[in-house]
């Protein structure tokens, strides 16, 4: 996802930061993880580095899954590695990321800590995500990186892999970067590396922060006996967490049209946004089509057809087309259904202002207390929605709401991607001064190290390490986070994934989505026409990439065929269902949590 921050969204960021600070003071330290196998003793007493390291360990880097001695040992490794780079004249580096709470914590706190402990100054710029992508594109085109390190969405993995401008970390850690790689890095502890791995099996990015897109609902309203009785009388099944889009639609209609008001204020059964704006594209590329069931079966992304509707060769290397006529699914019946439901629900069940809102403007609305459920909700809003005094928070600080897996459309099948997960990841250019890259790699490892990662997770609620997720500190926080900890502890989380490797040039293709979706919102185009146009434009871009060539695996479009003959019930593009609204299905929230613990996606 690409976040754009309006004034409203900036308030969300501030609230996230404030809530994170509150959490830090309540979570106890833990020492459950194994010590990093770093060479050398803990930092020797008396040195400036020792004083700085001890200060930060005692005052800031708590809780941690490491003991204080283990933290000191890990920091000693960073001090020694940095000393070798300083001897080569490296005293300062520049890195960049988007503006979310986690990265603000890195820029304002961890960069300062890194400088005090290692002596290398870090200029960690915070800019809008759209600007990160634009600057990244410019650097890729010129061949000169304007930063020593980048935190870039793993959505660009297919782009990075194919252009050959981004460093392959697997080979770097085994070769030129071996002496700069923390022995305690513990890659297996990272939960998102499958999302940053290319078709060649090599790691191209190191995860720095993650958040998922889930279903959000007012558990307190869903538990009201009068509403449960009223819903069952009308629909014939229990009011609960919707398992399919039919139930979501029924619940949306129920709250908007039947309940109408709660405590004298209007209540709506749905919330969304529809303004013609780049954020409208992310509303779809962040896996909306996969939730409907547009793609093929496959984790992390459908194979051979992914959630953008792009078909790739059997080895996942060569994109072959987005339109149904080329074997893709961007304008398939399932994709058209997904767009149709998005438009219909927003116009029928959301506040009337929703169609004119951007992502940043719509994000804070559920916290105001007049939304009963939202099918497309980012866990990055968790902390903002747990502030005391909000209409959606109890007096004891526990939320009145919960998060759950998003319901699935009628085309969805077991084994498909279930939803989206954002994975902001450290990215480095190949043709960049080696010592500058090494220093930036040190900083990247520092801000993701076990010494600091649990505190960072509590601050921004964007976990990257299994050891942090399983810590006592997160257990203690869980009751106030509305299901976030339970989700990330579930083996089922692997079905929430970022954009995959089928997408050959994310920036060029992503910009096509919002312009076409917007025309379906305004009614200038039917959903079918909008998706037909989008699919054709995607094929045109991939044809240009094919002609221009790419370092690895450029697109090679399939010849056009008869779309009707491409549709099948064996795989994507799926043929149109006779009934796109089966009976609604719901589940009790506690039963759902039990399924999560068992590793079931549903």
PLM region descriptions:
Residues 88, 112-189, 224-226, 230-232, ...:
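Extracytoplasmic "Venus flytrap"/periplasmic binding protein-like
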Residues 247-256, 290-356, 406:
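Glycine-centered hinge/linker elements that transmit conformational signals in sensory
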Residues 77-84, 101-121, 216, 220, ...:
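Short, polar/charged alpha-helical segment
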Residues 77-79, 399-408, 458-521, 547-580, ...:
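Long, aromatic- and glycine/proline-rich binding clefts that accommodate carbohydrate-like moieties
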Residues 19-22:
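Bacterial signal peptide processing site
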Residues 154-165, 170-174, 190-237, 249, ...:
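Periplasmic solute-binding protein
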Residues 197, 347-352, 361, 369-371, ...:
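Extracytoplasmic/periplasmic substrate-recognition and gating elements
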């Amino acid at each position: 996802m690409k976040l754009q921050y309006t004034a409203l969204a900036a308030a969300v960021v501030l609230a996230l930061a404030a809530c994170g600070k509150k959490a830090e003071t309540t979570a106890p330290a833990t020492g459950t993880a194994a010590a990093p196998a770093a060479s050398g003793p803990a930092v020797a007493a008396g040195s400036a580095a020792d004083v700085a390291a001890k200060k930060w360990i005692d005052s800031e880097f708590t809780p941690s899954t490491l003991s204080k001695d283990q933290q000191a040992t890990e920091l000693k490794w960073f001090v020694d590695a940095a000393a070798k780079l300083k001897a080569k004249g490296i005293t300062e580096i520049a890195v960049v990321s988007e503006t979310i709470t986690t990265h603000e914590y890195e820029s304002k706190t961890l960069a300062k800590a890194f400088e005090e402990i290692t002596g290398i100054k870090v200029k960690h710029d915070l800019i809008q995500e759209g600007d990160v992508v634009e600057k990244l594109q410019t650097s890729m085109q010129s061949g000169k990186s304007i930063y020593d390190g980048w935190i870039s969405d793993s959505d660009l993995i297919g782009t990075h892999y194919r252009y050959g401008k981004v460093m392959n970390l697997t080979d770097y850690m085994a070769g030129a970067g071996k002496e700069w790689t923390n022995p305690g890095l513990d890659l297996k502890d990272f939960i998102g590396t499958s999302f940053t791995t290319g078709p060649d099996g090599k790691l191209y990015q190191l995860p720095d922060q993650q958040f998922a897109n889930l279903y959000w609902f007012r558990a307190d309203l869903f538990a009201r006996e009068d509403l449960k009785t009223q819903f069952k009388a009308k629909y014939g099944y229990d009011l609960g967490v919707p398992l399919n889009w039919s139930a979501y639609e029924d619940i949306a209609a129920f709250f908007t049209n039947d309940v109408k008001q709660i405590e004298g204020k209007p209540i709506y059964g749905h919330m969304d946004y529809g303004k013609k704006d780049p954020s409208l594209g992310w509303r779809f590329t962040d896996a909306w089509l996969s939730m409907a069931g547009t793609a093929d079966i496959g984790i992390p992304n459908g194979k051979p057809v992914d959630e953008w509707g792009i078909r790739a060769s059997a080895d996942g290397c060569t994109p072959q087309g987005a339109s149904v006529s080329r074997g893709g699914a961007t304008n398939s019946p399932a994709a058209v259904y997904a767009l149709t439901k998005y438009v219909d629900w927003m116009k029928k069940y959301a506040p009337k202002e929703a169609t004119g809102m951007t992502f940043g403007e719509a994000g804070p609305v559920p916290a105001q207390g007049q939304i009963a459920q939202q099918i497309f909700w980012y866990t990055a809003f968790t902390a903002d929605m747990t502030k005391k005094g909000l209409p959606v928070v109890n007096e004891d600080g526990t939320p009145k709401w919960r998060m759950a897996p998003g319901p699935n459309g009628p085309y969805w099948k077991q084994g498909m991607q279930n939803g989206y997960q954002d994975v902001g990841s450290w990215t480095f250019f190949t043709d960049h001064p080696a010592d500058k890259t090494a220093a930036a790699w040190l900083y990247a490892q520092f801000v993701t190290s076990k010494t600091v990662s649990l505190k960072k997770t509590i601050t921004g609620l964007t976990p990257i390490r299994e050891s942090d997720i399983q810590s006592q500190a997160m257990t203690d926080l869980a009751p106030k986070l509305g299901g976030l900890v339970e989700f990330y502890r579930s083996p089922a989380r692997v079905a929430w994934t970022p954009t995959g490797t089928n997408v050959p040039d994310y920036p060029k293709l992503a910009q096509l989505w919002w312009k076409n979706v917007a025309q379906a919102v305004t009614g200038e185009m039917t959903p079918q026409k909008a998706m037909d146009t989008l699919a054709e434009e995607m094929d045109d871009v991939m044809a240009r990439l094919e002609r221009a060539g790419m370092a690895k695996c450029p697109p090679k479009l399939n010849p056009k065929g008869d779309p009707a003959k491409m549709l099948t019930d064996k795989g994507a593009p799926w043929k149109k269902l006779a009934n796109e609204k089966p009976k609604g299905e719901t589940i009790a929230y506690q039963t759902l949590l039990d399924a999560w613990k068992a590793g079931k996606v549903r």
